[in-house]
Amino acid sequence: MIELSRVAKSFGKNHVLRGVNLTIPRGQSMVVIGGSGTGKSVLLKSILGLVTPDSGRITLEGADVREANRDAFLARFGMLFQGGALFDSLKVWENVAFRLMRGATKLPKDEARAIAIEKLRRVGLKPETADMFPGELSGGMQKRVGLARAIAAEPEIIFFDEPTTGLDPIMSGVLNALIREIVIEMGATAMTITHDMSSVRAIADRVAMLHDGLIRWTGLVSDMDQADDPYLQQFIHGRADGPIESVR
């Protein structure tokens, strides 16, 4: 379980997070939504330890993440980055196995390659893809490679940063279904940040809306459409009028 208690972060006079409280239950898929510039990325980076909050506490299974051994802490995570973040100079299998051959794991090359090919198969890519380079793949295939890398080390927790960015609606649907399937299969805890409502409905067990540096609403995805928060309803239905627009 990941818990955030009154987490705040400012950059100069820009108060990005204003005291965020959020619980991500073990084995659940939490999707954090909100408009551009609402602090979703800062929230994610705070959990990962890439940004240090000004105040508040973030715990993983009750332990403060700031006091954890960093290598052991990060070894529990997998992540699918928004832009893929693949290394163009490495073959596909080397991208997938990157963590496996480094850090505390340091698997032999042959073993790491075998795991990489297995994970590529799991995300629907043929074994021959392993010896290609990222630049030879379509955007959708690159996203699948990124997903294979995220799950290669069998992480307990997987983060997804705008997973469908740059994909057409059909490929977005395929990737969303694949993410949901894999998270359930692995029994992983997942956190996704996105503004793509198709991802929300396909991936989430629970949803949290971040607005003006605070969690305005959180609950089951099945309760989202009936929630009485006007900001949430404006966002999920894509309306340009109403409370969100009026405060800008």
Could you say what each language-model-derived stretch is?
Residues 65-78, 109, 224-227:
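ABC ATPase NBD coupling module
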